[in-house]
Amino acid sequence: DCAGYMRECKEKLCCSGYVCSSRWKWCVLPAP
């Protein structure tokens, strides 16, 4: 199971293509 866009990544890893925001602790698109 993985965390999708804008989902919390405190306990789960983000789904493929997303990164965990260190500030907000949710999954976002990687910065260009």
Curated annotation (Swiss-Prot):
InterPro entries: Huwentoxin-1, Huwentoxin_CS1. Its main location: secreted. It is found in: Secreted. Pfam families: Toxin_12. Disulfide bonds join C2-C15, C9-C20, C14-C27. Expressed by the venom gland. One of its GO terms (cellular component) is extracellular region. Keywords: Disulfide bond, Ion channel impairing toxin, Knottin, Secreted, Toxin. SUPFAM superfamilies: omega toxin-like (SSF57059). The keyword Methyltransferase does not apply. Ion channel inhibitor. Belongs to the neurotoxin 10 (Hwtx-1) family. 16 (Hntx-8) subfamily. The presence of a 'disulfide through disulfide knot' structurally defines this protein as a knottin. This is U3-theraphotoxin-Hhn1r. It comes from Cyriopagopus hainanus (Chinese bird spider).
